[in-house]
Amino acid sequence: MAKKSLNETSPVARFEQSLEELEQLVQKMEVGDLSLEQSLTAYERGIGLYRDCQQALEQAELRVRLLTDPARPELAEAFEPPSLDG
């Protein structure tokens, strides 16, 4: 069977893959061997991965809320993460 692409996998699998890639990017950046351009590219990719992880966590929380009380799905409100603005 062909391996599923990142877009076809479950949100949990995408979260795990994104988190792993994000951790690898952080390690590369912490070493300090990247050029400024490479660092900026890695940072941009990292922000995208971070947002993907946040979205997957929000979806997981909604699923948990529905599973916890399926008789009252109206309680499954969207999770509002804290603002990243300082």
UniProtKB/Swiss-Prot annotation:
Keywords annotated in UniProt: Cytoplasm, Exonuclease, Hydrolase, Nuclease
Enzyme Commission code: 3.1.11.6
Molecular function terms from GO: exodeoxyribonuclease VII activity
Catalytically driven reaction(s): Exonucleolytic cleavage in either 5'- to 3'- or 3'- to 5'-direction to yield nucleoside 5'-phosphates
Keyword Hydrolase in record: yes
Pfam families, alphabetized: Exonuc_VII_S (PF02609)
Protein's cellular compartments: Cytoplasm
GO biological process, one term: DNA catabolic process
GO cellular component term of the entry, any: exodeoxyribonuclease VII complex
SUPFAM superfamilies according to UniProt: XseB-like (SSF116842)
InterPro entries: Exonuc_VII_S (IPR003761), Exonuc_VII_ssu_sf (IPR037004)
PANTHER family documented for this protein: EXODEOXYRIBONUCLEASE 7 SMALL SUBUNIT (PTHR34137:SF1)
HAMAP family: Exonuc_7_S
Family recorded in the similarity comment: Belongs to the XseB family.
UniProt function note: Bidirectionally degrades single-stranded DNA into large acid-insoluble oligonucleotides, which are then degraded further into small acid-soluble oligonucleotides.
Assembly behavior: Heterooligomer composed of large and small subunits.
Name assigned to this protein: Exodeoxyribonuclease 7 small subunit
Species in which this protein is naturally found: Xanthomonas axonopodis pv. citri (strain 306)
Source lineage: Bacteria, Pseudomonadati, Pseudomonadota, Gammaproteobacteria, Lysobacterales
